Amino acid sequence: MTSTDSSQATSDRYVVIGNPVAHSRSPAIHAAFARQTGEAVQYDRLEAPLDGFADAVRQFFAEGGYGCNVTVPFKLEAYDLADRLTERAEAAGAVNTLWIEEGLIHGDNTDGIGLVRDIQDNLDTLIEGKRVLLLGAGGAAMGAMLPLIECRPSRIVVANRTASRASDMLEEFVEAADQYGVELWGGGLDALDGLSEDEAVDVVINASSSSLHGEVPPVPEFLLGEGVLAYDMMYGAEPTVFLQFAARCGARTSDGLGMLVEQAAEAFYIWRGVRPRTAPVLAELRAALQAERKG
């Protein structure tokens, strides 16, 4: 047995499970966390059949696996599979982190906390007291809502292509918003044209699928002016078309690479009880993306 084989044999096994999953940067992120913290972690990719997610997870745990990160298209199935859910997983209606505890499968959703930590810690933008515009009302937006509310912004506006879906999503968070003193408003994307400049926002978060399709959400330019942070949950070697548009309008921009690293750090903390430093890992990933762009 080689030294590498020996270290893997004595390391606790974790995976990111999805379909497809070959593109995932999670193994590189968690390998960096393990080196930094000295934790004995082996982290791999696991592609599950589209009709075999639950069986793949159960088999992984039966073979001694410690935890899973869950990516598309299995986050809703992970929610159903978990025996125990955290409050934020219940609020999100989806799970991206699984682990075994006392024989039960536990599920959490670290996407939203990853988002707010990236915005507040890495981008130095305090959310408390700010006005936030959230574009989209799908799973990504659902996962962001409770962590955003817990930051106590003054107002969260949700705008979605289908207005009723935005309103329905906000209904799920009325109680939490009341608890934290947050005003909620939701409607269709076309309703943004009716906002006055007095109703300008401080942070615009694109949680819609528009960037996947190379589309720019119909956001009035005055909402993306100087002093506004425009954030896209997507990331890539090139800025998304939304971020390019926002930059032309004068906004400060950021993609979702930091969110990816921060949600991974939260999962690592859940599993290992050690919170890794994210800044050096984010810098490594950013450099890798820039190298891909030049290549």
Swiss-Prot record:
Give GO terms for biological process: amino acid biosynthetic process; aromatic amino acid family biosynthetic process; chorismate biosynthetic process; shikimate metabolic process
InterPro entries in UniProt? Aminoacid_DH-like_N_sf, NAD(P)-bd_dom_sf, SDH_C, Shikimate_DH, Shikimate_DH-bd_N, Shikimate_DH_fam, Shikm_DH/Glu-tRNA_Rdtase
Pathway listed: Metabolic intermediate biosynthesis; chorismate biosynthesis; chorismate from D-erythrose 4-phosphate and phosphoenolpyruvate: step 4/7
Q: Which residues does NADP(+) bind?
A: E87, G136, A137, G138, G139, A140, N160, R161, T162, A163, S164, R165, M233, G256
Check the record and name the Pfam families matching this protein: SDH_C, Shikimate_DH, Shikimate_dh_N
Q: Which domain of life is it from?
A: Bacteria
Q: Which family does it belong to?
A: Belongs to the shikimate dehydrogenase family.
**Name of protein:** Shikimate dehydrogenase (NADP(+))
Organism, by scientific name, is Cupriavidus necator (strain ATCC 17699 / DSM 428 / KCTC 22496 / NCIMB 10442 / H16 / Stanier 337)
Lineage in the entry? Answer: Bacteria, Pseudomonadati, Pseudomonadota, Betaproteobacteria, Burkholderiales
